[in-house]
Design a protein with these regions (language model features):
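Electropositive phosphate-/nucleotide-binding environments in soluble metabolic enzymes
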Residues: 15, 37, 51, 55, ...
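Acidic/polar active-site rim loop that often engages polyanionic ligands
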Residues: 18-21, 57-58, 140-147
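Amphipathic alpha-helical segments within well-ordered protein domains
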Residues: 22-23, 62, 196
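N-terminal alpha-helical segment
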Residues: 36-40, 57, 175
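Metal-dependent phosphoesterase signature
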Residues: 56-92
């Protein structure tokens, strides 16, 4: 069994889950436009440029969930996934996942986006919850505090979290050398460099340059 690792945002999804969630909550009147709209744009721009820290990136989006429980967010999350996410995961992306499933590979979704938002997205792709590696959220008394927990699953954190996942699942660290990882972003270069087969999917400019220099295949997915 080999591992097939997929980034979510910009790779399988035509868009960014965190950015879309923030926009969705602003339009729904849950978040104040004056407080969040410009900050959302700024965080996305800095993420793409590679100039924002994982702590700042993840903290901003965790803050959008503060003050409610999982149940308190359930209806909005369901509507968000149905209207903003499902239409943005195209047939080509789903076929790519299916190709690895047909090859009996174990499919993992590894994303900087938090676990609460990505659990139903992974399920919709047929990826079991134990095979989702996402940024964790802090809860107190069953309510999201607006902070993160554990190692953030972004940049070098993706390598750390994958190593922990391998250990928890009784798999040797050498499994990374046989794994395939699909990503669109230079933010994922630490994990792309760690796996045996890196594939750049609709890559940003920095990743496109790296892929060319490293001989990695570049995949343009019809959206």
């Amino acid at each position: 069994m080999k591992l097939a690792l997929f980034d979510l945002d910009g790779t399988l999804l035509d868009g960014d889950t965190d950015e879309l969630w923030c926009e969705f909550l602003i339009e729904a009147g849950v978040l104040d436009r004056a407080d969040f709209e410009a900050r959302n744009r700024s965080v996305v721009v800095r993420y793409r440029a590679g100039t924002i820290t994982p702590a700042e990136f993840c903290a901003f989006y965790a803050s959008t969930l503060a003050g409610r429980s999982r149940q308190g967010w359930a209806v909005l999350r369901e509507r968000f996934v149905a209207t903003a996410i499902v239409p943005r995961i195209g047939a080509a992306a789903r076929a790519l996942v299916a190709q690895h499933r047909d090859a009996d590979d174990r499919i993992l979704l590894t994303t900087a986006t938090n676990c609460f938002l990505t659990e139903p997205i992974a399920a919709g792709l047929g990826i079991a919850e134990p095979d989702l590696i996402a940024t964790e959220l802090e809860e107190a008394g069953g309510v999201f505090t607006g902070a993160n927990a554990g190692v953030l699953n972004m940049r070098e954190g993706k390598v750390t979290r994958l190593a922990s996942w391998l250990e928890m699942n009784g798999l040797a660290g050498t499994a990374i050398a046989e794994a395939t990882f699909y990503s669109d972003s230079a933010n994922d270069l630490p994990l792309l460099r760690a796996v045996g087969r890196a594939v750049a999917v609709d890559p940003d400019a920095r990743l496109r340059r790296e892929a060319g220099q490293s001989g990695w295949p570049i995949l343009e997915l019809p959206r």
